[in-house]
Amino acid sequence: MKKKYLIGTGIVLVLLAAILLGAGQYMLNYSLRPDNRGRDLAGSWQYMFDTYPYLKSWKDSLQNAGALKDTFIYAPDDVKMHAYYVAAAQPTAKTAVIVHGYTDNAIRMMMIGYMYNKELGFNILLPDLRDTGLSGGDAIQMGWLDRKDVIQWMNTANEIYGDSTRMVCLLYTSDAA
């Protein structure tokens, strides 16, 4: 009788552990691999143009002048990272690194880029964090690796705009870095 009880208890514990592990894995994947609108570049541009109509003419003028540029870096773990950058209309040391939030991409921060670049006269750099936009990676991060990536992007901004930059770093949400 005692042997049957132990076997039954063991089976119940193994099943319970399997259920808990399965549920934990499901929740982890759900939170770290949500519907990633950050990969939909065309949809992101369309959303921005619909929401902020002035961005269309600004983007078109930047592209016609060759001022909206792309750059790529590699993170220490060999993930290829992307950013857009635009120099200010007049030479300046003022630079803004503008970082998007969870499941977004650099495109969805262009309204802030517009303000800093066109209205405040800053150089701007807008990175795509891991697994968003044109950046590599197999999962969106929640800040742990992003913090180092943002520092690397700030160093890249110094390389692009000069070592004497006066920099502001805008993080859209707390999980950005």
Question: Predicted segments — roles?
Answer:
Residues 17-72:
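An N-terminal hydrophobic leader/cap segment in hydrolases
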Residues 102-115:
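The serine-hydrolase catalytic nucleophile loop
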Residues 77-87:
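A short loop-to-beta-strand scaffold at the N-terminal edge of the catalytic core in hydrolase folds
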Residues 172-177:
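Conserved small/polar residues in nucleotide/adenosyl-binding loops
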Residues 140-161:
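Alpha/beta-hydrolase active-site loop
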Residues 117-134:
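Conserved alpha/beta-hydrolase
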Residues 93-100:
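Short beta-strand element of the alpha/beta-hydrolase
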Residues 163-171:
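Alpha/beta-hydrolase fold nucleophile elbow
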